Structures are given as structure tokens and as C-alpha cells.
Amino acid sequence: MYSTKLKSPIADLDVKKRSLLFAELAEIAYKKKTEATKSAKSLGFTTVEYYNIAGAQAYRFMNKDDFVIACRGTEPSEFNDIKADLNALPTRAETVSFVHKGFKTEVDKIWPTLHEDIEREADTRTIWFCGHSLGAAMATIVASRCTGSFECPNPAELYTFGSPRVGFKRFVQSEPIKHYRWVNNNDIVTRVPMWLMGYRHDGERMYLNTWGNVRKMTGWQRFKDKMRGMWRGIKQGKVDAFSDHSMSGYVSNIFLWSEGKENPQN
């Protein structure tokens, strides 16, 4: 059961509560439509639309105030998702510069339908974007198109969790809306594609340390914290780089932060 219950527009929430809401929606995006609809309605959304076109998947969660696009992330059992992740060649973006070809291809599949829905339904609503893993990359490209390639009413913010690098420097610097980019310690997906290929991150890094607590750190401090997390994972018999990518881990840690609490450091 999710903890958020909207009683007013999303914009009325502070960044902690918004981060939790979008983490929960990014997790809900992995569910089948019946279950996702039930979960989304428990959060305060009245209508749910599921896009599933040639293996590319996303949800639209909507109420009278807000329009949320939540893109589904990589599912290990779906060959289409794995193929998209691996197709890391750069290709020309619809807006500016270059993006990851596999991620763009997934967005291209759902974009015509999504574009129509935005033009029809979003005129009086605030638009938000979120996603985890592959879904984070897709949400980033969708947000860029919504505000860069056509007149998109009322765009608000982008929330990504465990996002890979999506585009080249000029693309990410042209990102037109506020982006909160959540990174859980050693999450391996946040390290690919390699920066040597020209790909870059952008947005405000929201870093969860070894114990899952939000911290502002320098690059050197993050390096030491990642080494600490890796060693802690070894002692617990797990591979930290993979376990840190779990969406449920993001949700539970952000929930504590939103409540003004922290995980114990042990």
C-alpha cells in the first residue's frame, strides 16, 4: 500500500513529498493495468491510460489538476527492453544534439499517441514526468519533446530514479524543466552509457548514500561512500551495484526522507 494520498494539486506538495509520489508512480508503472489502476486511484488519480506499443510501455495518471507520464523501466524478461538498453549508438534527437538510439526508439513508438493525449487532455492540467531505469531515460526524452518540439501547456518537473545517461552535453543542457535525478549509491545503471561515448547526466543529483540517506556530497566524498557501500554489500553477500538499482529501495529510502527520518548507519 502506498503512503501518498493527493488532496490538492501536486504542486502544493514540497519536494520531499513530490519525490515520494513520483517514486511510487515509477514503481506502479511496472504493474499490469488492473493493478496499476487500483494503486494509482489509491493515490488520488481518477483516470489511468496504459500505452503498450511494440514493447514500449508507459502510463498516464490523471485527475482534475494533474497529468503524469510515468514510463516503464527495463524488465529482464522482455527482450525488447534489453535490446533498447544495448543499442547505445548516438542518434539525432528530435529537439537538439544526440541521444541514445535505443531509448529514442522506445519513445518514438509511443510518441504519436502520447502527443495526441497531451494536446487533448493536458490543456488545463499541470504535466509531470517520471520513470525508473529505461523508463527514466524515456521520461527524459518525452519531457524534452513536450517542451522543445511543440507548444506543451503547463509542464512542471521531471523525476528520474536510477537513470542511465541519455544524451550528449548539448541535449542535457537544453533540458527545459526542473529535473530531480535520484541516484542510489552504487546503482550500476547510472554509470552507463560511458561518458567516453559523449553521454552526460544532467539535473539536480539527489544522492542516497550507503545507508540510503539523502546527502549532498563532493565527488571525492561520493567515491569514498561508493567504496563503503560496495564493501558493505560484499559483507552482506550481495552485489551492491545491482541491488542498489531496485525501485523498491528508492521508494523505501525516499519515504523515510519525506517523513524526516533516516536509516541507521550500521
What are these regions (language model features)?
Residues M1-C130, L134-N266:
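Non-catalytic, mobile gating and regulatory segments of ester bond hydrolases
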